[in-house]
Structures are given as C-alpha cells and as structure tokens.
C-alpha cells in the first residue's frame, strides 16, 4: 500500500462515526473514586451502565461528532482551590484544580485516541512527555550518557534549563487550531476538538459555595485527556521553528535539545552557540504566546574546568549554577552521580522521620500496612533513577543501611539485637533492595539493546563520542558497569549480551531468576 493510500485509510478511520466498542473500552478504563464535574456524574455511574445504557451514550457521542457541538456541561469546569503552604489569605498560596464532566472526558479520550496515530510520527524524537512507551528515564539516560561521554573526552557541554511561565494556561487557542491542521488533524476530528473549547467557561467552588460562571478564552483545559497531546504538538512546533545548527555532537548525532512536555533543556558546545539557540527559542515562545521565566531558568556547564556561561533573555541575565535537578534527578557540573545518591538517601531518611511515629513504630498499625507504605513511598523515594547508577561497594552498603533502617523498625528490632538483615527480610517477606536495583538496571540494559533505530536513548547508547582522552584514570562508564554486572550475576559475557537481551521473553525470564547478591547481610 502506498503512503497516499495509507493516509486515506487512516483518515477514513479517524473521520468515521464512533463505535460502541470504543466507548465501552474507554469507560471500562475510568478510575473509580474520581470527583465529578458540574453535572455531578461520577465514574461509577458510567461504569455501571449496561449494553443499553452504553448504546445511548454512544448515540450521544455520535450526535456531538456529527454536529460538531457538545452539551454546555462538557465545556464547563469547576475550579477547586487547594492550599499549598504559607499564608492562607494569599491567593498565590493556592493551586486550583479543575473538575470536568466525566461523560465529556470520555468523549475527549475517544478523540485523543484518534489524534495519536496521526501526530505521533510527526513529533520529534526529542519530545518524550505524554507519549506512549516513553518516560522520564529516556531523557535522564540520554543526558547522563551525553555528559558521561563528554567528560571522558574533555568536551564541555553548555546547558540551559528553561522554565516556561504557566505554559499550559498560555496556549492561544486560535494558533493551536492552525498547528493541529499543520500536523494533520483536520475535518470532523478538528471540529470535534474545537467543540470542547467553543463556549469554554468555569466557576470556582469553595466550601460548597459556587461563584458565577466566567468565560475562559486561552489555555488548555486542565484535567482533560486531550490536553497533554495538544500541548506536546504545540511545543513540538515551537521546537522545530527554533531549531538551528547548534548542539552537542555525540558520535554521528547532534543533540540540541531535550523536551519533556514543558521541561526544556537546550544543549550546545559553547556559550555563544547556546546563546543563539536560547535567543531563537525565546523568540518563538514569545510569538506563540509563552514566556520564559528568567528567575527560574538556569545555565550550567559540564566541564573539567570552571567555565563562565553568561546567558541573557530579554536583557536579563540567567543564573549559572553548579547543580540542577532535572526531572527529579540532580545533575552536577562535574557529572558525578554520587551527589544524587547521597541526596536520595537523605530525602528517604527525611520521609522516614516524618512518618516514624504515625507509621513505622505505631503498634496499632499492622505490618502489612507498614510494608505497603514502605513499598509505595519509601522505596520509590530512595531509588528513583536507580537504573542509571554505577554501584560501588560503598554505595551498596549505604543503600542497604537505608533499607534496613526502615525494615528493622517495622520488625521491632534494632542493630543491638544483632539479627542478620537476611533474617529480617525473610521474616517480613521482602525482596532485597539491591536485588530490585540490579534487576531494574539489567532490564533497562535489555530495553536499550532492543530499541529501534531512531530512538534517542538507543542511539546514544550505541554511539561513541570522538576526541582525545586526557591523562588519568577514566571514570567507570555505566555500560561497562552493567555489562560486568551481567557477567558476574548471570554469567553472560559482554560479547553475547546484545544477542541474549534481544529476545525480550528470554531476558525477562533470566532476570526473574536473578538470585540475591551474596554477602554478610
């Protein structure tokens, strides 16, 4: 089938009427317990509909699709202010969440499922936010590998971490419809998307009291299933228009930016190049109705020498920092992951202190409940981003100490009881945390080997930077570390890793058999 025929077939699917099976699938995936919108229809009501009820709901959606208009309740948002911290009399200390009609959100999800196959092939690889099969780990690995290789060959990397002011709320809707047209969203599908915004309005609800309705003419609808994909399309167009020749060369690739929704990192090999890239990006943002926050955007240089990186936006100088937290992980100008691991241990200790009396040692709380909190809060806090760590014996010892600090207290023990860690884990039926970390690292290695050509993490994984290594012992590379881990723990030599991990089912079954690391614990 030719590309023209494929496009026509794709268009006929997305422009066709909405089948009941599609509505049923979306309704079944609704999460129970969610707050209703202005119509007070809860997700449980929709999930309890029988075949007849779903057929009537489908008829309603097809009327909206055919006429290009929706009920007013679907266009109405209920804004509920949530207190953050500080003075309760200050409006800036509240964050508003918007509750939308559940039937309207189901309709929006149906539209989102039709938009995805059209726009996904058109969105640049540099954007990983709100995209299926991608997450923060993709960009965290890409940036880590880029900095690792650049440090090895003494190539400086100039970075600007860009913060956009209230990006979701500033998207001009008129411009957005034009961008959607450019990206192939046209005809009845575009009309259906616009229908959710045509008479957009909101009210504020506080302690049961409601304000008067007021119109909303700009920005994306908070809480709408359509908003994420609409936003990344709009950001992709800004990124495309601001793209230039600058960037950081890594093997055969030149990487100039990384985007995760509105989290933007601009990359260049010199301060001058980075200033040019930032100037273009700022101009495109301004033209698209967005503004860069100069107080929150920061510059950083990853280099063996201290290098100044003065950057300006609109005549204002950006701060230059020695470390920056990107997507939840701390990156430093020296590129050492030890600072991030230390921070993770410190943050997890703070979490344990905050719940010590109310959870950890509370006798009225069952062990099952305590371990549930351990798995859902403590472990993710301690190990976020662990797939990228290069573990040493010191690191393993510190991670195990942080792990057992919590588990001993759950078991009602202390170090003075001189009970082995393995005994405590066996009693609590908890998997060793180091085993979880190593299994995840090897799982990510297999994922990188299997990534198709064109995916950025896979490309930098396979690429080798060029240049001359300076004198001295090089740092341990993540790939060397995890290859050695596979050899030590699974008996797979480095030259066979790609072949073995290339079969996902085989690799997953091997990892499920990974035994705990032998040791004194």
Feature annotation, model-predicted:
Residues 92-123, 138-141, 165-168, 217-245, ...:
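Conserved pre-motif C helix in the palm subdomain of viral-like polymerases
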Residues 3-12, 187, 204-224, 228, ...:
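Short linear motifs embedded in intrinsically disordered, charge-biased segments
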Residues 16-28, 56-63, 110-115, 139-151, ...:
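Inter-domain linker/hinge segments that demarcate the starts of reverse transcriptase
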Residues 19, 38, 42, 53, ...:
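Hydrophobic (often cysteine-bearing) scaffold residues that line and stabilize catalytic clefts
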Residues 1-91, 106, 330, 468, ...:
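Surface-exposed loop/turn segments and immediately adjacent short secondary-structure elements
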Residues 40-49, 63, 127-134, 161-167, ...:
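Conserved short loop/turn motifs at secondary-structure junctions
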Residues 33-41, 79, 89-99, 137-181:
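Conserved catalytic palm subdomain of right-hand nucleotidyl-transferase polymerases, strongest
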Residues 1, 33-36, 55, 67-72, ...:
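Short helix-interrupting loop/turn segments at helix-coil junctions
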């Amino acid at each position: 089938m030719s590309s023209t025929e494929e496009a026509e077939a794709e268009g006929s699917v997305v422009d066709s009427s909405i089948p009941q099976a599609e509505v049923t699938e979306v309704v079944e995936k609704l999460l129970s317990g969610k707050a209703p919108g202005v119509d007070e229809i809860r997700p449980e009501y929709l999930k309890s509909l029988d075949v007849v009820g779903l057929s009537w709901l489908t008829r309603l959606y097809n009327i909206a699709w055919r006429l290009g208009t929706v009920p007013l309740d679907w266009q109405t948002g209920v804004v509920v202010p949530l207190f953050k911290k500080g003075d309760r009399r200050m409006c800036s200390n509240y964050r508003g969440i918007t509750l939308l009609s559940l039937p309207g959100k189901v309709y929006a999800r149906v539209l989102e499922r039709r938009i995805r196959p059209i726009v996904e092939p058109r969105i640049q690889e540099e954007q990983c936010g709100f995209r299926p099969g991608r997450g923060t780990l993709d960009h965290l690995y890409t940036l880590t590998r880029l900095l690792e290789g650049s440090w090895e060959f003494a190539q400086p990397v100039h970075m600007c971490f860009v913060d956009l002011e209230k990006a979701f709320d500033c998207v001009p809707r008129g411009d957005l419809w034009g961008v959607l047209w450019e990206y192939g969203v046209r005809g009845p599908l575009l009309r259906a998307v616009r229908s959710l915004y045509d008479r957009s309005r909101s009210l504020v609800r506080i302690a049961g009291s409601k304000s008067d309705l007021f119109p909303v003419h700009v920005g994306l609808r908070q809480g709408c299933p359509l908003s994420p994909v609409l936003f990344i399309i709009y950001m992709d167009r800004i990124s495309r228009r601001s793209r230039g020749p600058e960037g950081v060369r890594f093997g055969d690739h030149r990487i100039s930016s990384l985007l995760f929704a509105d989290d933007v990192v601009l990359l260049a090999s010199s301060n001058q190049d980075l200033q040019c890239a930032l100037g273009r990006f700022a101009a495109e943002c301004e033209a698209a109705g967005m503004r860069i926050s100069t107080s929150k955007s920061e510059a950083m240089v990853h280099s063996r020498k201290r290098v100044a990186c003065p950057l300006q936006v609109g005549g204002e100088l950006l701060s230059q920092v020695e470390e920056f937290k990107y997507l939840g992980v701390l990156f430093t100008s020296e590129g050492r992951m030890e600072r991030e691991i230390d921070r993770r241990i410190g943050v997890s200790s703070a979490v344990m202190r905050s719940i010590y009396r109310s959870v950890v040692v509370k006798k009225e709380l069952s062990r099952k409940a305590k371990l549930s909190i351990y798995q859902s809060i403590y472990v993710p806090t301690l190990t976020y981003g662990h797939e990228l760590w290069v573990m040493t014996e010191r690191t393993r010892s510190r991670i195990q100490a942080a792990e057992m600090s919590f588990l001993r207290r759950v078991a009602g023990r202390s170090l003075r009881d001189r009970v082995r860690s393995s005994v405590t884990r066996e009693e609590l039926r908890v998997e060793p945390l180091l085993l979880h970390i190593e299994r995840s690292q090897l799982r990510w290695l297999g994922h990188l080997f299997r990534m198709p050509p064109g995916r950025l993490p896979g490309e930098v994984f396979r690429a080798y930077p060029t240049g001359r290594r300076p004198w001295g012992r090089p740092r341990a590379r993540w790939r060397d570390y995890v290859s050695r881990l596979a050899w030590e723990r699974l008996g797979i030599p480095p030259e066979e890793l790609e072949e073995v991990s290339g079969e996902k089912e085989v690799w997953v079954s091997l990892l499920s058999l990974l035994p705990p690391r032998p040791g004194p614990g």
